[in-house]
Amino acid sequence: MTNNEILRRIQHALNLKNAQIMKAFEQAEVTVAHDKVANWLKDESDKSCVKMKDQELAVFLNGFINLKRGKKDGEQPKPEVTLTNNMILMKLRIALDMKAEDVLDVLEVVGINLSKYEIGAYFRKPNNKNYKQCEDQLLCDFLNGVQFTNRPDSEEFTG
């Protein structure tokens, strides 16, 4: 999945307005224009779509954590230059104040049944022997589960 698609899915799953996305960036001490957010959210087939970089998505996710959980005193975390699906899943889990059991419940909503041990493998450090790489499909399923949990009457996100 592209960063643009991930941002669109997050927006759809949590029913976020563009202004709320801009506010998340502000919480990470970065200002983005409404036009830039709108261009990130456009379908990749649209010529005015602007490709979102890993670092930009990392800034959004860090700001989203601050927005949802409260900003910590002191220096803000530096945004990662390269993001993995595992990092994105972890940041979303933190922002949404979820424990491993909550993630399992969200995945169960979309028919994915994992054990606590299996889900824990996605939250380990990459050099851990039990680390498991989060594939696009699992991240997509997680976001669909979040959507159906937060917006039970919504339809599956298709684009």
Map each language-model feature to its residues:
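Leu/Val/Ala/Ile-rich N-terminal alpha-helices, chiefly Sec-type signal peptides and the beginnings
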Residues: N3-A13
